[in-house]
UniProtKB/Swiss-Prot annotation:
Organism taxonomic ancestry: Bacteria, Pseudomonadati, Pseudomonadota, Gammaproteobacteria, Vibrionales
GO biological process: pantothenate biosynthetic process
Subunit record text: Homodimer.
One GO CC annotation: cytosol
More info: The reaction proceeds by a bi uni uni bi ping pong mechanism.
Binding site for (R)-pantoate: Q61, Q155
Organism this protein belongs to: Vibrio vulnificus (strain YJ016)
Name of the protein in its database record: Pantothenate synthetase
Residues at the catalytic site: H37 (proton donor)
One term of GO molecular function: pantoate-beta-alanine ligase activity
Entry keyword set: ATP-binding, Cytoplasm, Ligase, Nucleotide-binding, Pantothenate biosynthesis
Function of the molecule: Catalyzes the condensation of pantoate with beta-alanine in an ATP-dependent reaction via a pantoyl-adenylate intermediate.
């Protein structure tokens, strides 16, 4: 495994691999790697000869300075895990390398509509920061394929649209969410939880399953479902951030043409903002009567 901090050195090595006809897969991360990230690496291995992983905590996508400062950084442990997966190349740039003139003078990439709805509405600039850094990393690595987790459902949709709109010749592969034994979606932010908070955290996934069951049972009173779900989270000590029920394909309101809904949830627990999602098949009778209701839960953080 080779580790590069300099863009030019990484590019030279990738050019060598490409001259040899090697297929390149890319997994961008912000470090603090867990089994979910390693699952992405293994999926990347299935689609390419060479796997490149980046570790970069992107300041442009954080909307709160304390969140950026608190984000876990575990480079030595991350490199050990990647070495265990036989990753060929690891890219570990500094913010100064990615944004040499600072964030204020950086050319920006923004995917309209998708970036400003749902989570993007409450986190202005977040998805612009994601799209910008992913575009830059794609230009540096020049991968044939890139793997992203489905846990960040809206982010994956944005990256798919971005690569299509900008005619990037990169195959985007979504990888299902990896969960702990108790159902909690694996996340680097889980490390911010205290022992007590960690015991309560699976309530997010359980509440999501309750919503899914209600929808599969034919309920289409989404506003009431969201209100009840918010109450369940509060009862367990979580602070609901956002709960949406949307068309899984368009992320717009569910309508009579929708065949699948996606439940998008986030909640605060201590210092951590937890997110999760689940796709649900819509009951035909329910679809025909749905009033395209969707609502954001009361933000009580």
């Amino acid at each position: 495994m080779q580790t590069f901090a300099e863009i030019s050195a990484l590019r030279e090595q990738i050019k060598t691999f490409k001259r040899e006809g090697r297929r390149i897969a890319f997994v961008p991360t912000m470090g603090n790697l867990h089994e979910g990230h390693l699952t992405l690496v293994r999926k990347a291995r299935e689609h390419a000869d060479i796997v490149v992983v980046s570790i970069f905590v992107n300041p442009m996508q954080f909307d709160r300075a304390d969140d950026l400062n608190n984000y876990p950084r575990t480079l030595e442990d991350d490199l050990s895990k990647l070495n265990g997966e036989a990753v060929e190349l690891v890219f570990t740039p500094t913010p100064e390398m990615i944004y040499p003139e600072g964030l204020d003078k950086q050319t920006l990439v923004e995917v309209p509509s998708l970036s400003t709805m749902l989570e993007g509405a409450s986190r202005p600039g977040h998805f612009r920061g994601v799209a910008t850094v992913v575009t830059k990393l794609f230009n540096i690595v020049q991968p044939d394929v890139a793997c992203f987790g489905e846990k960040d459902f809206q982010q994956l949709a944005i990256i798919r649209k971005m690569t299509t709109d900008l005619a990037m010749d990169i195959e985007i592969i979504g990888v299902p969410t990896v969960r702990e034994m108790d159902g909690l979606a694996m996340s680097s932010r889980n490390g911010l939880l205290t022992i007590d908070e960690r015991q309560r955290a699976p309530v997010l996934a359980r509440t999501m399953r309750w919503i899914s069951s209600a929808i599969r049972g034919g309920r289409d009173d989404f506003a009431s479902i969201i209100e009840d779900a918010s109450d369940q989270l509060r009862a367990a000590g979580l602070h609901p951030d956002e709960i949406f029920i949307r068309d899984a394909r368009t992320l717009q309101a569910v309508n009579t043409e929708s065949t699948q809904a996606v439940i998008l949830m986030s909640a605060f627990l201590g210092k951590a903002r937890l997110i999760d999602n689940q796709v649900v098949e819509l009951v035909k009778d329910s679809k025909e009567e749905v009033d395209s209701i969707e609502s954001e839960s009361e933000n009580s953080h």
